[in-house]
């Protein structure tokens, strides 16, 4: 969805703290004692809001708001600016609260995502009536409780069956300019009210990944209706974000050839999942030139994600001056060769298909030209005969500016020391590391020890996520995890070693170890 604060640059924390010092006698204004709380209340409200708006972690914003009742009331617009209801229980509890107990909170919501019956955990949950969810949102909108809503996304098991949801949001939420929905096994209604919006800034349509037994219910030739394209191409000239996504696991393949007809001067974010650019009357070769012209006509693009299907153009061939603002790219290994803006790309994702050792060596040659790269997500599939240390060392040496690495290895088990040794010998200073790998079933690792060893090897590490499975996998979004560990690296102990804490969640989704946010470390 489109960010309302895209134009803002982060305000340095040091500047915020210096402003706080001018208004309070106690530098440690956010500690938990009552005297500090009194000093905190003397800090100007606009400075507190500035701090909260520039904290990326929602839990830290909550911790800051819990400093005092005064601060909590001040930060309500920040706390509720973006609401993502990620489960049926969250949908039910939050919507009932907004309808009955706290109707005042709805006026702060600018971005709302509802995910009834979302399969996020392995624990069985009672199905939630999605019609009730839709009608609850209709009641909120018609009663004027969502006046500032700018972005709405529906992620249920099926598109809303009652079209009044979309017509009500369009009528009662004058600031709403970004909408989206997922699609279940039923066909898309061409006359849906979802396609009646005008002047959109963002639009999202995703296909639900369905169980195999549901495939028989899929339409034989699922098509995107003309009404959708008319809304986007003819009536949304100021479109900034477009996402049409189909999972690799889905047998549904949408024809997205008409996207090349769009001309959106403000388009910043384009994401095309595993869709097709070659229908019955055309081929992949015939679509390469129109699609390259389309990309060249959108110089404001900052984020681009392309699919991996054989029916989509495999190579990118663009003039040297094209895509000058591109900073984030996701696609195939073959795609990155033709990108005209390699030295300025900061985020790269190569997770559509696993890379062999031979293909990785080719990719590393390209990575060496990406001097600004700080975030890399990559999926490797190496055989048992591979020199894993050499592979990891070559990868790390090819992108020495990395601060975030998300590495998935779906081959036979390898020794962890091969990765830690490569990391120790490199110049990479990682801040976050996500590692997904296959492990022997008879050798379940101690993830805390692994995280501690990684933090010792790379002192800059602050967050480590470790995932392992006993079997290989075909798709990254369907890995049969045996265990997942999330770790935070705190300050060093007196002995010099890192203090690594596992991040565990209670039912309320708050961390066991978290305390009210303190800014004393910046002062």
How would you label these PLM feature ranges?
Residues 1-61, 65-74, 87-104, 138, ...:
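Eukaryotic N-terminal targeting leaders
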Residues 4-6, 18-24, 34-37, 46-51, ...:
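Leucine-rich solenoid repeat modules
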Residues 36-132, 154-159, 184, 313, ...:
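Hydrophobic regular-secondary-structure patch
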Residues 52, 85, 114, 151-154, ...:
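Conserved beta-strand positions
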Residues 83-95, 158-162, 184-189, 250-252, ...:
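Acidic-and-aromatic substrate-binding clefts and catalytic sites of carbohydrate-active enzymes
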Residues 92-96, 126-139, 221-229, 285-289, ...:
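Well-ordered, non-membrane alpha-helical segments in soluble/globular domains
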Residues 119-344:
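Leucine-rich repeat
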Residues 193, 197-238, 352-404, 408-409:
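Ligand-binding grooves and catalytic loops that recognize ribose/phosphate and carbohydrate rings
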